[in-house]
């Protein structure tokens, strides 16, 4: 988990698209959201919006291990630092796997 989340950032997630879609409802929590293809628009309860887009990436290979990857792009609009942090902390806890 980070201490600061900028208004726009990208990250890789070690999951398949099917896994991500299964996590999506819980990761959104109480916020209203709508999916359109490989994107989701989220209406944040404290005001502001979040747009997330994803695309499958080639797997990450470490020795004999292959990890699936999704490229994720996050864009907050009209959300202050507190609203971004509050949403992303829940999101990160919900999607965290292993010891990471």
Residue ranges and their predicted role:
Residues 2-8, 47, 67-69:
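A general secondary-structure signal for short beta-strands and their flanking turns/coil
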Residues 28-29, 91-99:
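A common structural junction motif
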Residues 11-15, 44, 74-79:
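Short beta-strand-to-loop capping motifs
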Residues 17-22, 80-86:
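Short, conserved charged micro-motifs
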